[in-house]
Regions:
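All-alpha prenyltransferase/terpene-synthase fold signal
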Residues: 1-324
């Protein structure tokens, strides 16, 4: 059994060794640039961890794990373009270094490369893996569209938001685990339990992100807090604040949502103060714990020893208590 840290080192080394020797360089240089940015690599690590529950040698799953990471970075590349984001992981985004058209085309190439890497799995698993991967990719598009639609709405409900983050974030974590389990020879029941584990962990993970954007320590978080507040992003925090606010609090919240000329620090302080008075931090923590517990319940019934599941149990605890 490998630790999550050991698996991270292995997949980082494998990705660093990738050579994109095809031309033109203008298409492939941005791909190499995006993959060189690093990141948590949580999705390929989860795939390797699920595989490692059943098999000791994880090298046979390096290509599919690379595929899931290339796919994830493709979505980030296009997200950055849609959001007009200037930075990603402390570096300039592809459309800033090159241009919009290059970002679109290199992103498209990454999607194709992701499918090529994913298809490098045993023939007996190929259809199941590719069917799940394709469904997941489509669901992520659905989640992204929901998120974009929410920008134009002021009546987003909790259940809609949770469904959006399930599609936009959770399904790829869940698929990473299920694909790893299938390739490792898990039973259909275990593969589905690990999928449920990833699904619930993903929702809890996103809720933690929502929380950290308001209450994170800037020095630890690595970026300024309050970004979601400044752009009126429909997070769990804002949705629950609007739901539980009294008349005066609702008026103040709506003022800060609609005002266009404001001091950023003042807006963050005012909205955070409203969140504190309304009590949304506790509401978010409770919902996060609910999904965390569901994830652990699914992991508990996976039919391998507790010792072999220890790293997954440790990982979800680290994600829930992280400060970044």
């Amino acid at each position: 059994m490998f630790t999550a840290s050991e698996l991270l080192d292995k997949i980082n080394s494998h990705i660093a060794d990738l050579q994109f020797e095809r031309t033109p360089k203008g298409l492939y240089d941005p791909v190499a640039y995006v993959l060189s940015m690093g990141g948590k690599r949580i999705r390929p690590v989860l795939m390797l961890m699920a595989y490692n529950l059943y098999k000791e040698d994880v090298r046979p799953v390096f290509s599919p794990a690379t595929g899931i990471e290339v796919y994830h970075n493709y979505t980030l590349l296009h997200d950055d373009l849609m959001d007009r984001a200037d930075k990603r992981r402390g570096k300039e985004t592809v459309h800033k270094v090159w241009n919009d058209n290059t970002a679109i085309l290199s992103g498209d190439a990454m999607l194709v490369l992701a499918y090529q890497f994913m298809a490098e799995c045993p023939a007996e698993h190929l259809k199941a893996v590719m069917d799940l991967f394709s469904l997941t990719a489509l669901e992520i598009c659905e989640g992204q569209q929901m998120d974009m639609d929410f920008e134009q709405r002021s009546d987003v409900k909790e259940e809609e938001y949770l469904e959006m983050i399930r599609l936009k974030t959770s399904v790829l974590l869940a698929a990473s685990l299920k694909i790893g389990a299938l390739l490792g020879g898990a039973s259909a029941e275990d593969a589905e339990r690990l999928y449920d584990f990833g699904m619930n962990m993903g929702v809890a993970f996103q809720l933690k992100d929502d929380l950290l954007d308001v209450y994170g320590d800037t020095a630890v978080f690595g970026k300024n807090i309050g970004g979601d507040i400044l752009c009126n992003k429909k997070t769990y925090m804002l949705i629950k604040a609007l739901e539980h606010a009294d008349k005066e609090q609702a008026t103040q919240l709506k003022h800060w949502i609609t005002v266009t000329d404001f001091d950023p620090a003042e807006k963050i302080e005012a909205v955070t103060g409203l969140y504190n008075r309304i009590g949304v931090k506790l509401l978010c923590e409770n919902k996060m714990s609910e999904y965390n517990n569901k994830a652990l319940e699914s992991l508990a019934v996976v039919n391998v020893t507790a010792e072999r599941k220890r790293e997954l149990d440790k990982l979800i605890k680290e994600l829930m208590y992280r400060e970044v």
